[in-house]
Structure formats: structure tokens, C-alpha cells
Amino acid sequence: MRLLSVLLIGFLCLAGTYAQKYQLSPAYNDPYLTDDKTGTHDFWVQNASLPVFYGFHDWNFQDNSGIMEINGDEMHITGKIYPTVNMGDCHRYNVDLVFKKDKSGNVMPKKELRESAYVPHGPIDPATWKYYTFVQGKWTGFGCDPQNVVFSGAEGGMPLQLGYGANGKNGDNGISVWLIYGYTIVDINCNIRPIITQSPTQPPTQPPTYPPTQPPTQPPTQPPTYPPTYPPTYPPTYPPTYPPTHPPTYPPTYPPTQPPTQPPVQDCSTLECPEGFHCEIVNNRRTCVCDTTVPPTHPPTQSPTYPPTQPPTQPPTYPPTYPPTYPPTQPPRASCDNVRCPRGYHCECNHWENVARCVRNEEPTHRPKPPHHGCRPDSCARGEKCICVRGKIYCIPKTTCDQVRCPRKHHCECNRKGQVFCVPDCPKLTCKQVGCPENHECVSRRGELHCVYVRPPTGRWGDDLSDLGYNQASVEAAIDAYEAQRGQRPHNNIPSNNLHQENNDNLGDGFYDGVEIGFADGGFDVNDLNGF
């Protein structure tokens, strides 16, 4: 009895430390649940131009080496990855990521599928997802030119999410998380499939309590634990031919010398299966079996009908309006496990049509955008620039031309967006090389050339007299006095035969184009104005 208790306690301790393992595979893109064109990768790198990624965006686990092990509250992801675009490339990495179960209960799920895929419109329920926060992780390189990639955390502090539809690509059971390396993001999108391992066989919890069904045919192999009432004088010559009149009232104090003829009955009450699996007894052994039936997205509109227990005695008088009474058998769910595709192709499983096809690998043209950071126009003061590093906002001074030293024959310029550039110097021009428009002339001011407007001459007589050094007001007063003395009208009404001019210009417009003005009766010369 004590031995059985020790064995039972040891088995319970082993069951408490039993770890569940999952096989990781690339998450395919389901066009019925998402508009995203990417998919079928385990890891996707946002900035593949960094030297540690060798120019490759997509990385997958090699030879089904991706394993996710959950032991209590700790998750451990391991495996070997290679670039999917060039499978013959010699760059390889060993993956080692550690996560811890999040128990805060205030995590917002990252929904990357269409809104119609989630409840109440679709079958995916984010309330059933589990979350694991990042602890540590790295890629250790091997092969040619090995390098190491050490991750600093998760984008925005978002944890890894696990469940049906959590991979962000389809509705299967999977995981997804955005890890940070420097200033770039490494996206994980994987489907998971549990690896069924047989748990250790439980010893019998109680000794057998049933009495023997037949009398013993041979004497006991060991002496009884209690002394006999009197010593036997000789061994019996033949076994007794009749059974005992009544069974023993107490169990034996020692374990049976022979094993029981039947194994102990297994019970599913103590075996916990992962999501998507249930316990069944097969050949008297407990095992976790995959759920083959897909739960309906809406309740049935009618109650199911059952086949009749007896055949009808009379044929029906009218044809039935309902479908056959026997339920259709559920076809097996399509799987890519046994499908081998040629080079350059991969297997995709369409659960809506329940078929598995080999499709050509395509270079992804669209990448998921990382979550927007919190930088706003008013986050920093004037002259500072806002940046977001690992989910935190920092204000750094903007670069100006005072802080930039350009090479020889170059100078610094700053555009409207505050960006600073070193541009080559232009050769200096002279006014002889600049062509200005009409009525403009070239002028050099502070080392810069400008075309300025030059007012053309108006041709008025006052301007000509002023150019000769006469005062315009005095000249007009002298002309008015002279005309008043002669008793004549102003010059614009003088007949054209009473005056003459050197240039024979028309005086009807009221302006004197020439300098000399003469009259027929003796004349008036401009030199006579010296007395005024």
C-alpha cells in the first residue's frame, strides 16, 4: 500500500511538469478573411537592407524544425530558419525566443483580419486568445558570414497572441507578434499544430479488492504473515476439490504475486488536451484526438430529424418536402501534411472548399504597416523634431546650416521642410551676362544682381527746361506774362501759322518738344527768360 502511494505521488509530480509542444508552420493568407496579399512566412523583416538580414524579407523554419513549447507559464520557441526567396543561400539562423504568460487581463487584441471575420459577424472570438509578454530572444547565425540578431522587445509593448485567428492571416490556430531590432520590425505569423506525445501510464490507484474466483491449485509460494495455529505434519498430497464456503473478509496484506489479467481502466477526466483536441479512449489508452467537426457560425433554423425506428407500413400519400432524415457524413478536413509541392510552389489549404493546392510562390508586394507612434505636430517645441523609439517619444534639436560643414565648392541650403543639403556653388555672374527686359537695367547690390525698372523720358517741355537748368514754375510764369502783354490766348490755341519750331512738331498737344520757340512778330527766345 505504501509503495502504491509513492508511485501515485511520483506520477502526479510528472504530470504537473508535463510540457505541451507545438509544430510551427508558415501562416497562409486566406482571401476570404483578409485583404492582405502577404502570407506563407514564419518571419517577415521590415527593413531587409540591414546587413544582418542579407536583403531577404521572408524567413521560414527549415525541415519542420520550428517548435513552440509551453511549460506552465513559460513559452519557448526554437528552430532553424532560412530565406525563402533563395533556399540555396548559405545564411542560416538558430531561433531562441522566450515569452511569459500575461496575467494582467487588460491586453487589447491585435485584429488584422476583416471586421466580418470576428464575432458577432464571424467565427473568430478574440476573447478566447491567450497572451505572452516578451522576455528575451535572439537569432544566432551559422553558415557563411554568421551574425547575431538580438531583439530588444515587442513593438508598443504588445504581447504575443495565441489562438484561432490570432496569426492575422487566416482562421487557424496560430500566433503573431511584432519584435523590435534596432529601428526595424520583425513580424511573426505562424500556424501551430500540437505534437501528440503519450503521457506515462498511470499505475493502479487501488489494489484489487475482488476475491479469487477459483480455489488455488498450488500451495502458496511464501509463508503467511501470521503464525499457524498448529504446525502441519505433512504437505497435502492433492489440492482441495471444493471452493471455500465464503470469500475472505479482509484484503491480502501483500501485493498479488501475479499481474492482473486486464490493464487498469483509463479515464479522460485527468488528461487535459490543447485547444482543438479532445480526449478519447483508443485501445484502452488515453489520447488527444483532433476535432474534425467545425462549429457552425449560426444556430440551425430547424431541429434535426432522426431516421424512423421501423419501416413505414404504407407508402406516403405525398412526396416529402424535407431533406433526407439521415444526417450527411462529415468529409475529412483537407490538410497540407501529406502534400509535396515542386520547387517554387507551396501548399495552401482552403477550408471553405476543403481542398489543398500547390500554388506558385510570389514576391510580396505589400507589407503590413507598423502601429502609428504618438508623435504630433505639438509634441515638441519650435526648433525640435519628434521621434519615437521603442514606443517612447523623444524631442531632438533640428539640424541647421550652422551645424553643417560642407565640402569645398559647396554651400549649405535649408528647404521649407527643415531639411539641410550641401549643394555645389554656382559661378558668379556679371551684369554683362544678364539680359534684363525692356525699360530695365542690371544693378549689383550686396553681391547680388537685380534688374531694376528705369522710367522712360516723357517728352514734356518742363522736363527739357529743367534739364537746361531753368526753374519750371518761373518759365511758366514768364510765358503767361508775355502772352498777357501781347493780348493773346494760351499757346495751345495759337494758330499754327503764327509760330514756328526747329523740329516741325505739332504744338496742338500742349507740350513744347523743342527748346527754341519763335513768333512771327519778332519772336520769343528761351534765352529771354533769364530776366525772370
Swiss-Prot record:
Keywords tagged on the record: Glycoprotein, Repeat, Signal, Sporulation
Places the protein is found: Spore wall
Region described as Disordered: spans on this chain: 197-265, 297-320
InterPro entries: Fol_N (IPR003645), Plasmodium_CSP_Invasion (IPR051860)
Gene Ontology BP annotations: protein localization to spore cell wall; spore wall assembly; sporulation resulting in formation of a cellular spore
Signal peptide span: 1-19
Glycan attachment residues as annotated in the record: N47
Recorded GO CC terms: glycoprotein complex; spore wall
PANTHER family: SPORE COAT PROTEIN SP85
Domain notes for this protein: The N-terminal part (1-200) directs accumulation in prespore vesicles.
Subunit structure: Binds to cotE.
Name recorded for this polypeptide: Spore coat protein SP85
